[in-house]
Amino acid sequence: MAKTNGFMGHDMLAPFTAAWMIDMGPLVIDKAEGSYVYGVNGKKYLDSLSGLWCTVLGGSEPRLIEAASKQLNKSAFYHSFWNRTTKPSLDLAKELINMFTANKMGKVFFTSSGSEANDTQVKLVWYYNNAIGRPNKKKIISRKNAYHGSTYMTAGLSGLPSLHLKFDLPPPYILHTDCPHYWNYHLPGETEEEYSTRLANNLENLILKEGPETVAAFIAEPVMGGAGVIIPPATYFEKIQAVLKKYDILFIADEVICGFGRLGTMFGCDKYNIKPDLVSIAKALSGGYIPIGAVLVSEEISKVIMSQSNQLGVFCHGFTYSGHPVACAVALEALKIYKEKNITEVVNKLSPKLQEGLKAFIDSPIIGEIRGTGLVLSTEFVDNKSPNDPFPPEWGVGTYFGSQCQKHGMLVSFSGDHVNMAPPFTLSLEELDEMISIYGKALKDTEKRVEELKSQKK
């Protein structure tokens, strides 16, 4: 259908898309209703990833649409430069300060995306250390397999080789420590807590090797999303935070995916007792209806930044759309809905059925691990149920599973041989049953495909 609608070989340079996909023609989405999206091909798809982890209230929440329309009719745009701003941006900043309770925050800086938020974090960390007389404390430690965005800085922070390849990344001041994927990387007989201890020791050794006086911050998602929903092993963040505190290294919590209920708590920091100095949010902040992100800055860092800006005459960082009034109005309405619906309770009621329903497929011979919490889950396909036996990349097992899901009427995210699902919080029990059913059908198709490929290999 894409061809007949004139979209084959289209003119858009599409993100995270190979040229051969463009030549085939894209799946073009025409409209959204609740948990479903509809293509111009007339087909209906259950959206099991909430767009890109963001449309948590479904695709047709009238209150968010009304909030945007009302603000557009009142004031479509005004900036927040030079001590000028709009009421929605001030109201949203106050609401976020009150809402985030894992640590006391002092200020909110608005962006248009999670990438911009994480990019801003690095500048704030450098600005802060310069202000307090630590000009050499600039290195940022991230984790292997992490995803923190795709700007120059945040692609460097990301620990995925594909984001670095041919982009001359990462820069030398960005370092990467272990990915905390217990199933994949633990030693024989090693418990989760022992694994966490080893990773914390490795982090400390990296800091000592680089020189603690040169390491400024550590960035982490509470649960790693793009890496394939990596759940932190027992005591991991407790041990990591102890190392950071020992060497006076700031903690940046990337809550872009985890924030606003996805894990069954309002923020991932609440679930894992993380006390961050800086926090990045986006995606569900507006329910995905309009681009907006934000940086939450601790009281201590806020005071230093404000003092430094007075000395310099200006805090010289910002974007045209920082605190866009329409985006802020939509975000305010989204936060109201989360409170009214007690969204974490909604997630915790749906979570057991999603987790148990999909984890029931763990005995499949092509599945190594199904991992998840709250309303987020990932399936990792391997041979012999072992992380040491991946399928040949050219087999495209994860891609094939994703294509079969689409054929049966459901959209998932796939990267390599892991497949992610993070459905809207508005999902009905019937829709959840449909999701599990389609997953099972696609899995059978994929098992058959793997058997065919194995027989051809003999």
Swiss-Prot record:
Record-level Gene Ontology MF annotations: 4-aminobutyrate:pyruvate transaminase activity; adenosylmethionine-8-amino-7-oxononanoate transaminase activity; pyridoxal phosphate binding
Residues the record lists as binding pyridoxal 5'-phosphate: 114-115, 254
GO cellular component: cytoplasm
Record InterPro entries: Aminotrans_3, Aminotrans_3_PPA_site, PyrdxlP-dep_Trfase, PyrdxlP-dep_Trfase_major, PyrdxlP-dep_Trfase_small
Compartments where located: Cytoplasm
Keyword terms of this UniProt record: Aminotransferase, Cytoplasm, Pyridoxal phosphate, Transferase
PTM-bearing positions, type N6-(pyridoxal phosphate)lysine: 283
Sequence similarity: Belongs to the class-III pyridoxal-phosphate-dependent aminotransferase family.
Its biological purpose: Transaminase that degrades gamma-amino butyric acid (GABA) and uses pyruvate or glyoxylate as amino-group acceptor. Cannot use beta-alanine, ornithine, acetylornithine, serine, glycine, asparagine, glutamine, glutamate, valine, leucine, isoleucine, methionine, phenylalanine, histidine, lysine, arginine, aspartate, threonine, tyrosine, tryptophan, proline, or cysteine as amino donors. May be responsible for establishing the GABA gradient in the carpel.
Official protein name in the record: Gamma aminobutyrate transaminase 2
Organism: Solanum lycopersicum (Tomato)
Organism classification: Eukaryota, Viridiplantae, Streptophyta, Embryophyta, Tracheophyta
Underlying gene: GABA-TP2
